[in-house]
């Protein structure tokens, strides 16, 4: 399974083409739209989320509520485009255009992208570099999550800590309903209240906040990924996908950075066997991956999200046309997007996992894949 996305932050729409989905996957807009809604929620979001009401539209590859085996094409309209139609007009015109951006914003792709492509209007960089692009990748991830759900896999994204506040209530699958109702997707109401207070303070001071996001999956078969070649190692693929999320600057599988400061005897998960459970582990400090492959335990992917780079009290910069000092431009932005980023991390991790299932089990139809996965589960149980 592979996919491409296209579209700008203030263009008419976002697009995706997904190739390699099996025929017969039950799929409707309502399998995708709830995930788009989750991405738009979260305390600390900006005015853009008031304007947009993201809804996916199928353009190809789905008929009668099922995939046909052909490429699936998705579209999400940008409601804000009506306010930017002249600025984003693809027709030839004289430069500079309205709302041209020449003062590179620190922490953004503006300057490096301008240098790379020779743009003097840095809007040609920021429009594609914007996190708005993740709306379509979440839609693709929702398709992957639908496929995984039919293979017995469940996923969730949440926030273990943000704004300098850590949740003291550990994650449990029983807390998923609480997470889904939480404005910060946190497990701990007290920590959440303090984080909200800090978000309000940062907003009043024209500042931004980051945090830690985590995606968890259960029900995975062991053996997804590979130890044979470096580029098939699942932890490497998950890390690459996580680091492709705008503002993510670090990733770990399980408590990796904590593990790094301990002895091996304190870190590695002992293996047990019983007739009822087969092979199992009492701990999961490996985060569900060993040797680049799933172990069958819960998969835990954690990422660090830096504070959003667009500040209401902008940092000093330089105009790329005049080379004169300037303050960075103020583009509409969030105070924090950590809760939304946890949804994005879950959706994007699901894409990698769906790809791993399709690579391992193959099959042109959903029924074929389900049969092959079940036979594999039986073989693993008998091992």
UniProtKB/Swiss-Prot annotation:
List of residues binding FMN: 128-130, 291, 306-310, 332
Family indicated by similarity: Belongs to the chorismate synthase family.
InterPro entries assigned to the protein according to its UniProt record, in alphabetical order: Chorismate_synth (IPR000453), Chorismate_synth_AroC_sf (IPR035904), Chorismate_synthase_CS (IPR020541)
Reaction(s) the record says it catalyses: 5-O-(1-carboxyvinyl)-3-phosphoshikimate = chorismate + phosphate
EC number(s) reported in the record: 4.2.3.5
Keyword Flavoprotein assigned: yes
Record protein name field: Chorismate synthase
Subunit structure: Homotetramer.
GO biological process: amino acid biosynthetic process; aromatic amino acid family biosynthetic process; chorismate biosynthetic process
Cofactor: record remark: Reduced FMN (FMNH(2)).
Function summary: This reaction introduces a second double bond into the aromatic ring system.
PROSITE patterns: CHORISMATE_SYNTHASE_1, CHORISMATE_SYNTHASE_2
GO cellular component: cytosol
Keywords: Amino-acid biosynthesis, Aromatic amino acid biosynthesis, FAD, Flavoprotein, FMN, Lyase, NADP
Signal sequence bounds: none
CC cofactor: FMNH2
Gene Ontology terms for molecular function: chorismate synthase activity; FMN binding
Keyword NADP: yes
Pathway recorded for this protein: Metabolic intermediate biosynthesis; chorismate biosynthesis; chorismate from D-erythrose 4-phosphate and phosphoenolpyruvate: step 7/7
Gene: aroC
Organism of provenance: Thermus thermophilus (strain ATCC BAA-163 / DSM 7039 / HB27)
Taxon lineage: Bacteria, Thermotogati, Deinococcota, Deinococci, Thermales
Residues annotated to bind NADP(+): 39, 45
Enzyme class label: lyase
């Amino acid at each position: 399974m592979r996919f491409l996305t296209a579209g700008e932050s203030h263009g008419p729409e976002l697009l995706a083409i997904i190739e390699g989905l099996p025929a017969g996957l039950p799929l409707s807009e309502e399998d995708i739209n709830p995930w788009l809604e989750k991405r738009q929620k979260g305390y600390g979001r900006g005015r853009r989320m008031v304007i947009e009401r993201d809804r996916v539209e199928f353009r190809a590859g789905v008929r009668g509520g099922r995939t046909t085996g052909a490429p699936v094409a998705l579209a999400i309209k940008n409601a804000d485009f009506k306010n930017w139609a002249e600025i984003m007009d693809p027709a030839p015109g004289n430069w500079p255009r309205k709302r041209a951006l020449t003062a590179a914003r620190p922490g953004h792709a503006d300057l490096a992208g301008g240098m790379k492509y020779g743009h003097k209007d840095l809007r040609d960089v920021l429009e594609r570099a914007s996190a708005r692009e993740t709306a379509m990748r979440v839609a693709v991830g929702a398709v992957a999550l639908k496929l995984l759900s039919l293979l017995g896999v469940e996923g969730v994204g949440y926030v273990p800590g943000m704004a300098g506040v850590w949740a003291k209530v550990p994650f449990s699958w029983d807390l998923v309903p609480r997470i889904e109702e939480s404005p910060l997707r946190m497990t701990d109401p007290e920590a959440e209240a303090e984080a909200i207070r800090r978000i309000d303070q940062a907003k009043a001071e024209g500042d931004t906040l980051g945090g830690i996001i985590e995606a968890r999956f259960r029900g995975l078969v062991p053996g997804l990924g590979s130890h044979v070649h470096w580029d098939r190692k699942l932890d490497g693929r998950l890390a690459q996908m996580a680091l492709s999320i705008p503002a993510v600057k670090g990733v770990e599988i399980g408590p990796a950075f904590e593990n790094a400061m301990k002895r091996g005897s304190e870190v590695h998960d002992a293996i047990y066997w019983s007739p009822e459970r087969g092979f199992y582990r009492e701990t999961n400090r490996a985060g569900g991956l060993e040797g680049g492959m799933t172990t069958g335990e819960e998969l835990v992917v954690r990422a660090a999200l830096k504070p959003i780079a667009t500040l209401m009290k902008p940092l000093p910069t330089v105009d790329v046309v005049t080379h004169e000092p300037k303050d960075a431009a103020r583009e509409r932005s969030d105070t924090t997007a950590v809760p939304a980023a946890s949804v994005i991390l879950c959706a994007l991790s699901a894409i990698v996992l769906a790809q791993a299932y399709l690579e391992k089990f193959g099959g042109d139809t959903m029924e074929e894949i389900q049969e092959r996965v079940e036979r594999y589960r039986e073989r693993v149980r008998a091992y």
